Amino acid sequence: MSLFLKDDSIQIREVWNDNLESEMALIREVVDDFPFVAMDTEFPGIVCRPVGTFKTNTEYHYETLKTNVNILKMIQLGLTFSDEKGNLPTCGTDNKYCIWQFNFREFDLESDIYATDSIELLRQSGIDFVKNNEFGIDSKRFAELLMSSGIVLNENVHWVTFHSGYDFGYLLKLLTCQNLPETQTGFFEMISVYFPRVYDIKHLMKFCNSLHGGLNKLAELLDVERVGICHQAGSDSLLTSCTFRKLQENFFIGSMEKYSGVLYGLGVENGQIVH
């Protein structure tokens, strides 16, 4: 499969409450053969910053992440599965490559706190908050199905992300039905249990001739084209998947195991792991 995908070769499978179980059944079928899972979430932005004295930058960043994730709700989750060569699974009668976009119901514009600019961006990107409230997935039900899906708690699954502290924060909160751990150490202990192999592209970029910038900029530099709409989780997860593969081809030889387990902006101070 070429990394230069076209819109008409991809099916973004929209998942709502009424088709959640059937789509999760499909995912259970593909994960063994396509164990690289690129992930992105959409959430209501960052609404508060902690005050006080912090020993390290990463301690401050984690406190910010924890505070926001604990009071906010995930809106969308995108998952793109691929094999070690970057091939995507095909589904349905038309044999299109499949990626998944999960729409959640809990976030309520009328009663929940949010960052106005973030919500406006998501609205402009086509997210229908009223539809999500009415037809979206119940997150507790999703968590139960995710736990038995084979994609978490599995050392054979490689999670691929971009600057993903918040993404994993929301997933951990969803999976455990609890607020995030008080400390970074506790957070990374949970990451290592639920997501044993994690690659954060933003961290990997440090080892690639000083590449910098966001996901869209990196994809542009590597000639990876977006399929779908920016700031929707399905499209962003696909761009993450393709960009990771291109980065690996261009800059890394052999196993990437030593780069696993580090999330950009968390857990590392002056090159030393502090969690």
From Swiss-Prot:
Pfam families named in the record: CAF1
Location in the cell: Nucleus; Cytoplasm
Key words of the record: Cytoplasm, Exonuclease, Hydrolase, Metal-binding, Nuclease, Nucleus, RNA-binding, Transcription, Transcription regulation
Any Gene Ontology CC annotation: cytoplasm
Secretion signal, residue range per the UniProt entry: none
EC number in record: 3.1.13.4
Entry-linked Gene3D superfamilies: Ribonuclease H-like superfamily/Ribonuclease H (3.30.420.10)
Reactions that this protein is recorded to catalyse: Exonucleolytic cleavage of poly(A) to 5'-AMP
Keyword RNA-binding assigned: yes
Domain of life: Eukaryota
Single GO MF descriptor: RNA binding
Binding positions for a divalent metal cation per the UniProt entry: D40, E42, D167, D236
Swiss-Prot/TrEMBL cofactor(s): a divalent metal cation
InterPro entries documented for this protein: CNOT7/CNOT8/Pop2, RNase_CAF1, RNaseH-like_sf, RNaseH_sf
Stated role: Ubiquitous transcription factor required for a diverse set of processes. It is a component of the CCR4 complex involved in the control of gene expression.
Family: Belongs to the CAF1 family.
Assembly notes: Component of the CCR4-NOT complex, at least composed of CRR4 and CAF1 proteins.
Name listed for the protein in its UniProt record: Probable CCR4-associated factor 1 homolog 7
Source species: Arabidopsis thaliana
